[in-house]
Amino acid sequence: MEHIKKKMLAMKLDKENAVDEADQLEAKLREKELEMQTKDEEVAEVLKKIQQVDTDKETAQTQLAETNTKLEETDKRATEAEAEVASLQKRIRQLEDELESTETRLQEATVKLEEASKAADESDRGRKVLENRTFADEERINQLEEQLKESTFMAEDADRKYDEAARKLAITEVELERAESRLEAAESKITELEEELRIVGNNVKSLEISEQEAAQREEAYEENIRDLTERLKAAEDRAQESERLVNTLQADADRLEDELVTEKEKYKALSEELDSTFAELTGN
């Protein structure tokens, strides 16, 4: 009986020890569960931060692409404006050359007209005093005819020079068309490069990066956007300045064309007056 009591007492102690150990294990389990819950919350927070960084990165990439597009468009406008400025400057030089040539022809025609007028005056006086000098009169007529031939030759030479200038202008227009063709080819190449850039952008999006690397890229994108924004502003200023210069040059070209038309009309009037004078001198 005493042995049974000892055994029951031992079993009771074992039970109490087992209960204590179970309580300790349950406490440790609860601690582990709390620790796991905390870890899960930390992981969720990190994932949330990574997701936010990815969102910020995509936004930065979108802004970068838009800024690049605006910059390319502005550069294109500036390049086109500069090309138009060069074309207008070349056209102005051509107009100035034509105007100078026309003024020279006008001066020559004026001199010839003055000579013809003097010759006409001399002829009038000569007819009064040389009625009985037929040979001298005929010689004078021959001289006037030679002068007429010379004036006609000069007028034809001036016409040839004008035709040559027109031919050069036509050649210049052909070269301009070729330049436009090269510009179209360049625009096609730009389109191809934009497509390659889009493909590269898609590949970049597919890369998995850590939170620290994503933050560094986001900072780099923002710095690039600020740089591109400054370049975009500078390019827009340059494009506006080029547009103002184009307007000024266009006004100069219009003015020179008007002056050229006026000089041509003066030359035509003088030529007609010269022809009329020679016709009167020759009695036609």
From Swiss-Prot:
InterPro entries: Tropomyosin (IPR000533). Residues 56-78 are annotated as: Disordered. Residues 1-284 form a coiled coil. Keywords: Coiled coil, Repeat. The keyword Repressor does not apply. Pfam families: Tropomyosin. Associated with the protective tegument surrounding the sporocyst. Tropomyosin, in association with the troponin complex, plays a central role in the calcium dependent regulation of muscle contraction. Homodimer. This is Tropomyosin-2. It comes from Schistosoma mansoni (Blood fluke).
